[in-house]
């Protein structure tokens, strides 16, 4: 009944089975990067605010030597051949790399599989080679390239591949132990690393940001992967990406390269504005692939798709990826196909790591021909001979569609991309789009909770802590829009700033060496842990904030000691309950009037986001059903044209048939009064029309789940009706005005 909370794969952080705390914090501990004894500033500048001088266009000059464009490209080409075993650059790779080596910023918009990563990996390796020629820096003073990416598995894969090539690279992620993090810190200070990968959430860590001024040689380059996430016009906006641009400026990075596979003209404008990239620094490769046959069929009912799918698979052999929206869909369709004589496996984020790896390996080696998957499958998959990409239901955006069909036919051979269109599937997508907009009352109550009496009386620079999870449940606001709200308070209104998060819960199981170890250490911290760690059954628990305040100790020192004890086997440590921490930047809203004004501004922004999400779904439907060549529509969506400005690709459904794909008309339905009454009978809530409409339409929310209303017959009782009409009826019941 309805969509389970965990049945939809967003695709953002679905590649490692880490818990929510790890995803939010992206680190072993909040103090893992706070240095006890900072080293000397490696660049020798006593004033950290002195800007880094950019190289002039055309050459990098020093008193010891000069490096022209030809020499720089020779170095890059040698690295391409020696380290990566490629004979030549493809498309715009050479131009983008040349610009970076020249000291300028760049944006790379290449399709999936077109080699974006080389555009920062080669410069990272080239910097020491260039320094040898110019003699501007010592061998161990060539600095670091930092790569920011939300995709943990991809970061790990790239680091492993670089290490196999003998290139010094590391990844700071949630799987690292405290000791491993400290080793990375040491290597950074000593100039031993060429590349460091991290998630955007890492940039909230004050210790990490502070560490940058002690990096030997400084930050030569920052690579921003999935850069479209910075744009509010983009299809997968992530608030933490807005902080990447701020990070680049604050640490005085010499240059930046942004990379994405899918960027429309408005998204490109946003990226260029945020990272100071001029028009001549944008490098694009066409999304048009002449070997891909873009096809679509529209059906009246979902069950009509099965026969079409069987026929397609019979006539189109080879490796096949079928994309479904829900985890349950993927499982059921794979089982259905297997029963019908088309052996298939399913893949989604809810599976165990070993299960996912086995299926991925079998698909890569063609032991499995067909995989039915959610969006969680495909990132980083570089299988050249995928013959078919099938969309079992409508993708969420044109960008998502483009990215997924781009996984077919990378060997240049003819491949097929089929999309099945059915109105019954639209409900799922609308459900996701509608679910992120809270009620205005919920937003106002949240702001009053954030800016309570204790917080508004804090002085500038003082900090406060909140639990996003707790606020999400209490105010019926999903984590995603909650993150957007906090990002706006930080970056748009400049009221607060996120700092290093903290774990609220510390528990450990003591081993036989626990007491002897603490007695040998014999420090104020060890004595405090011995005194204040309370044992209940087999676990000890301790409130580090309370202990630090009571004993006059640094919380980070207590954390470090617990990590040491854990790494040395004296305890088995369990941490949890992430609390976000914010610093006050300006005068905070105290009065009801001030809160109301802030509520109005934020709510308008959230409403705009909902509208954009719904419009993206409409764009996908229009892409398929408009009287235009699919290839041309796709190219124009990204601000491009077909080769030779052609109006037809000649090999899509529209070009074959000479007419548009006709979607059967929707059957108009009046609001069901009995269903309205059914919802009102299921709950006594009468002050939140949007909450009641969510129940009727079948939209899960924290409050719906907490009250177990998704288990009642009222949930989804109006899923086949117009949401706006439903909302209007419940506003009458709650006597609310229109938003």
Task: State where each predicted segment sits.
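Intrinsically disordered, low-complexity domain-flanking/linker segments in eukaryotic proteins
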Residues: 130-141
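Accessory DNA-binding and partner-docking regions appended to nucleic-acid-acting proteins
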Residues: 1-76, 99, 446-449, 453-739
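K/E-rich alpha-helical interaction surfaces of small helical-bundle regulatory domains
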Residues: 87-88
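Helicase motor core with emphasis on the C-terminal RecA-like subdomain
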Residues: 75-80, 91, 95-117, 124-128, ...
């Amino acid at each position: 009944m309805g969509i389970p909370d965990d049945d939809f794969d967003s695709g953002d952080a679905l590649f490692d089975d880490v818990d929510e705390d790890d995803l939010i914090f992206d680190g072993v501990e909040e103090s893992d990067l706070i240095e006890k004894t900072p080293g000397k500033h490696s660049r020798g500048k006593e004033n950290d605010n002195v800007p880094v001088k950019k190289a002039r266009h055309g050459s990098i000059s020093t008193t010891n030597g000069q490096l022209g464009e030809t020499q720089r490209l020779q170095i890059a080409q040698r690295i391409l051949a020696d380290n990566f075993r490629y004979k030549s650059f493809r498309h715009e790779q050479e131009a983008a790399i040349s610009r970076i080596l020249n000291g300028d910023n760049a944006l790379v918009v290449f399709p999936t599989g077109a080699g974006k990563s080389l555009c920062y990996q080669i410069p990272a390796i080239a910097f020491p080679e260039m320094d040898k020629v110019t003699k501007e820096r010592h061998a161990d003073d060539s600095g670091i390239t930092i790569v920011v990416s939300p995709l943990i598995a991809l970061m790990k894969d790239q680091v492993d591949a670089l290490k196999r090539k003998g290139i010094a690279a590391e990844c700071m992620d949630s799987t690292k132990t405290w000791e491993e993090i400290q080793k990375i810190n040491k290597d950074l200070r000593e100039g031993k690393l060429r590349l460091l990968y991290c998630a955007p959430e890492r940039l909230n860590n004050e210790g990490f940001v502070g560490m940058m001024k002690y990096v030997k040689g400084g930050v030569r380059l920052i690579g921003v992967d999935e850069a479209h996430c910075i744009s509010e016009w983009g299809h997968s906006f992530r608030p933490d990406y807005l902080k990447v641009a701020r990070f680049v400026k604050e640490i005085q990075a010499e240059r930046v390269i942004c990379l994405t596979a899918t960027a429309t003209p408005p998204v490109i404008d946003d990226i260029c504005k945020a990272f100071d990239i001029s028009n001549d620094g944008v490098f694009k490769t066409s999304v048009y692939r002449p070997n891909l046959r873009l096809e679509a069929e529209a059906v009246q009912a979902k069950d009509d798709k099965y026969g079409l799918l069987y026929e397609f698979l019979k006539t189109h052999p080879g490796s096949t990826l079928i994309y479904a929206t829900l985890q349950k869909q993927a499982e059921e369709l794979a089982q259905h196909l297997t029963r019908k004589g088309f052996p298939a496996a399913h893949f989604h984020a809810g599976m165990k790591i070993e299960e996912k790896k086995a299926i991925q390996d079998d698909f890569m080696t063609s032991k499995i021909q067909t995989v039915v998957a959610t969006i969680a499958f495909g990132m980083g998959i570089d299988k050249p001979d995928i013959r078919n990409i099938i969309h079992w239901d409508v993708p969420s955006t044109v960008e998502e569609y483009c990215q997924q069909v781009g996984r077919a036919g990378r060997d240049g051979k003819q491949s097929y991309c089929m999309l099945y269109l059915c109105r019954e599937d639209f409900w799922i997508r609308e459900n996701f789009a509608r679910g992120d907009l809270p009620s205005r009352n919920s937003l106002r109550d949240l702001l009053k909770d954030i800016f309570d009496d204790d917080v508004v009386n804090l002085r500038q620079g003082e900090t406060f802590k909140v639990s996003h999870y707790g606020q999400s449940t209490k105010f019926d606001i999903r984590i995603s829009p909650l993150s957007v709200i906090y990002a706006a308070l930080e970056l748009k209104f400049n009221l607060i700033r996120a700092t290093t998060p903290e774990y609220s819960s510390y528990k450990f199981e003591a081993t036989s060496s626990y007491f002897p170890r603490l007695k040998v250490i014999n420090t104020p911290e060890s004595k405090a842990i011995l005194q204040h760690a309370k044992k209940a059954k087999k676990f000890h628990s301790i409130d580090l904030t309370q202990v630090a305040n009571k004993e006059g100790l640094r919380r980070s020192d207590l954390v470090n000691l617990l990590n040491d004890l854990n790494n040395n086997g004296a305890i088995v440590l369990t941490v949890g309950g992430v609390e976000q921490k914010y610093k006050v930047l300006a005068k905070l809203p105290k009065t009801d009037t001030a809160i109301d004004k802030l509520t109005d501004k934020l709510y308008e922004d959230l409403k705009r986001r909902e509208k954009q999400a719904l419009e993206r779904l409409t764009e996908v439907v229009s892409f398929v059903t408009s009287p235009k060549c699919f290839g041309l529509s796709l190219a124009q969506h990204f601000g491009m044209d077909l080769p030779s400005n052609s109006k037809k690709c000649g090999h899509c459904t529209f070009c074959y048939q000479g007419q548009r794909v006709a979607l059967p008309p929707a059957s108009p339905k009046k609001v069901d009064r009995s269903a309205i009454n059914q919802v009102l009978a299921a709950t006594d809530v009468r002050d939140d029309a949007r909450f009641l409409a969510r129940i009727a339409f079948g939209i899960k929310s924290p409050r719906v789940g907490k009250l177990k209303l998704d288990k009642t017959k009222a949930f989804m009782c109006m899923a086949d009706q117009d949401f706006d009409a439903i909302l209007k009826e419940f506003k009458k019941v709650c006597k609310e005005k229109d938003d």
